[in-house]
UniProtKB/Swiss-Prot annotation:
It comes from the Bacteria. The keyword Nucleotidyltransferase does not apply. It comes from Edwardsiella ictaluri (strain 93-146). Its main location: membrane. The keyword Membrane applies. One of its GO terms (cellular component) is plasma membrane. It holds the Pfam family DUF412. It is a multi-pass membrane protein. This is UPF0208 membrane protein NT01EI_2692. Belongs to the UPF0208 family. InterPro entries: UPF0208. Keywords: Cell inner membrane, Cell membrane, Membrane, Transmembrane, Transmembrane helix.
Length: 151
């Protein structure tokens, strides 16, 4: 789905980048039809909060009712892996370079911010989805919501 190959990032570092990306992405309803991040972050937050207790409950429940240990452990491991899958996806997405259409919109947003007198740091290399998330967060705080009309 991405236009260019993503740079190699260490496995554990992807989870950290996923957490940072999840915290950075603005929770703006008008972005939801265009970007899947709103749905993925909501599902990942839910999974981080509720899946470990659900895993423990199902594990204890199956063992208490005399079930086999193998399927009980497999179910618990699957439930615990769901938040990790969300963070991994968000981490991969954070380091993915922007496709050409979003790249153009990214530069338009940067120009709007600079035209309104807001200082921005220069972009290092090719902009990624993390760069877009930081820019969108800044635009949501400092510009009116009409910048979302260009999506």
């Amino acid at each position: 789905m991405s236009s260019a190959p993503t740079p190699h990032v260490a496995w554990f570092r992807l989870f950290q980048r996923g957490q940072i990306y999840m915290k950075t992405w603005p929770n703006e309803k008008r972005l939801a039809p265009v970007f899947p991040e709103n749905r993925v972050t909501r599902a990942t937050r839910f999974a981080i909060r509720f899946m470990p207790p659900i895993a423990m409950f199902t594990l204890c429940w199956q063992i208490a009712l005399g079930g086999q240990l193998g399927p009980a452990i497999a179910t618990a491991l699957f439930a615990c892996s769901l938040p990790m899958q969300g963070l991994w996806w968000l981490g991969k997405r954070a380091v993915t370079p922007l496709p050409p259409t979003l790249l153009q919109w990214f530069h338009q947003l940067r120009d709007k911010l600079q035209a309104s007198g807001i200082a921005l740091a220069p972009v290092d290399g090719a902009p990624t989805y993390q760069s877009l998330a930081e820019l969108l967060r800044r635009c949501c705080k400092q510009l009116d919501k009409t910048f979302l009309d260009d999506i």
